């Protein structure tokens, strides 16, 4: 018998949407120009360049930029040292990761780009 994960999935996506919203608020509250958030946000996906060397190095570079450790450390250090660029960088990562997870894109497994910790994405 299959397990209905519906309610849990809704909660997980709501959590990620909250991370996305937090990143947007941090960006704006710390003087980040709203028109630059999306171009800055896209820079995070440069981490996919590792896939040119194969699925294992690709998953390593992608996951290094798509987990919450870096933005939380940047946010903490930026707040503690009053270093605005660190807070803005954290905001970029938080918005990117929050949106990716809200849409169902997870950390990559070393087997294939479409294999994530949230399940397989795309067709096939």
What are these regions (language model features)?
Residues 1-124:
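N-terminal membrane-targeting hydrophobic helices
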């Amino acid at each position: 018998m299959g397990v209905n994960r519906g309610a849990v999935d809704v909660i997980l996506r709501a959590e990620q949407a909250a991370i996305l919203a937090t990143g947007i608020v941090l960006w704006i509250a710390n003087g980040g120009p709203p028109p630059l958030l999306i171009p800055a946000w896209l820079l995070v996906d440069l981490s996919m360049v590792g896939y040119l060397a194969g699925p294992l190095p690709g998953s390593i570079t992608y996951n290094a930029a798509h987990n919450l450790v870096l933005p939380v450390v940047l946010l903490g250090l930026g707040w503690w040292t009053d270093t605005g660029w660190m807070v803005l960088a954290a905001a970029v990562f938080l918005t990117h990761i929050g949106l990716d997870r809200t849409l169902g894109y997870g950390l990559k497994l070393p087997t294939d780009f479409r294999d994530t910790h949230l399940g397989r994405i795309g067709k096939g």
